[in-house]
Amino acid sequence: VKQIPDKIREVCSKCRSLTSLVQTEYEELLHLFSTHCEEKMSLFTLKGKRRKAGKYAERKDSGLYGSRSKLDFLLMYLKEDTLQLRQGLLFEMSQSKVSEWLHFLLPVLEKSLAQMGYLPEEGFRFNAYQDTESEWFTADVTERPIARNLDKEAQKEEYSGKKKRHTIKNLVICDDQKRIVFLSDLYAGKTHDKEIWDDLDLELQKRNVLLDLGFYGTDVLEGVLPFKKPKNQELTKHQKAVNQALAQLRIGVEHAFSGVKRLKIVQHQIRLKKTKVRQQVLRMAIGLYNFRLEKRI
């Protein structure tokens, strides 16, 4: 197949199962994706070399002709985490060509989602002032499994005692509408949740952020944590009721993780080796989740 057949597109559930988007969402994303894709195709070759001056016209017998085929190719890869060899069989191209197209198209999708305003803030710094509508935030750490590193020292750093396997971590912050507004940089699986939190520069503008006991001990004034059971003692009924109420609010970030990991490329063990690409695919998965969330409220 060169693109998803029209008969499948007509069935909303089938389109969603292949791309994570319903048809109306897909068409809206395609409009902007096409603009950026055509612009990049006119300036650069598939290998990333700048084209010589002159008008560029895409050949109809090219591997992926038209923006619709390119978006289908990319969304299906992200949704199903397909082996590149299998993706090549589906789209009638070699594995090496699949790799070239992915490196070419991923930044195009990222640019489109950024222009639409669905990508989260990223890095070590978050300023809640830009999100003035949210009354409170929820923060948590998500882990993704990776292959065991050949380097023994790296193995120790990447081994998560909680998950009992090698992982990488990111801290995310959600607003009260379950929209993910911040994504931290990558951390090794050994890094404790509180250690990640303390490493970040967060300006919460006097708005509360709900945390779980993994962040116990943090000195952030806006942090709201559940009561911790004292050793050899029990929590009071009031403390249990407070913990239950906080858990009902904090569950929003877990729902957000579930929505992001609808894309299997951030759910399965990561085969991608480069840190930059590992971060990039999670950022785009969050962008697509925020896009779906806004359109389906």
Feature names for model-found ranges:
Residues 65-80:
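Short, amphipathic alpha-helical "recognition" segments used to contact nucleic acids or chromatin
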Residues 61, 74-76, 158-162:
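Catalytic micro-motifs at enzyme active sites that drive phosphoryl/nucleotidyl and oxygen chemistry
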Residues 1-62, 297:
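Charged, often Cys/His-bearing segments associated with DNA-binding zinc-finger transcription factors
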Residues 84-297:
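Short, well-ordered secondary-structure "scaffold" segments embedded in the functional core
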Residues 33-44, 81, 109, 260, ...:
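Short amphipathic alpha-helical segments enriched in hydrophobics
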